[in-house]
Regions:
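Active-site-proximal alpha/beta segments of enzymes that process anionic O-linked groups
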Residues: 2, 14-138
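Short, hydrophobic/glycine-enriched beta-strand segments
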Residues: 4-11
Length: 138
């Protein structure tokens, strides 16, 4: 059986501060924490594309703040790879255009000023579990 994958990206968070949240500490105990990482590009939109393609922005097409939507079609993209392997894929972002829709079965956009940040991610996971209908999910 394929494992479910929950990828959490904390934007602007320092490693020495993540242990403040009891919920996040529980998540760390049950999963894998990468505690020695360096960003490949100094802004979130580019960095998430580097993580999900395995290629620097120069190669994947997202090499500038205003090039978020320029992910090259020929570049392998983790959500597509997992989708092709039978995973149900979903994501939740503050703006849909931050990341290519390629390979995502379900996308949710949030208003960071109006929604409770402590509730939105558990709701996304619950929605993902329901929509995945027994398939492994990412």
């Amino acid at each position: 059986m394929k494992p479910n994958i929950i990828f959490v990206l904390l934007d602007g968070s320092r490693f020495d501060r993540i242990h403040i949240s009891p919920e996040f500490c529980d998540l760390i105990k049950q999963g894998t924490l990468l505690d020695n990482v360096t960003t490949a590009i100094p802004y979130t939109f580019g960095a998430i594309n580097v993580i999900l393609t395995g290629e620097y922005g120069k190669e994947n097409g997202v090499d500038g703040f205003y090039k978020v939507s320029k992910l090259k079609k020929q570049v392998s993209f983790l959500p597509e790879i997992l989708q092709n392997e039978g995973y149900f894929t979903s994501r939740g972002l503050i703006r849909d255009e931050i990341l290519s829709p390629r390979g995502f079965d379900f996308r949710k956009e949030y208003n960071e000023y109006e929604e409770d940040l402590n509730l939105r991610h558990p709701e996304l996971i619950k929605d993902t579990i329901e929509k995945s209908k027994g398939k492994p999910f990412f």
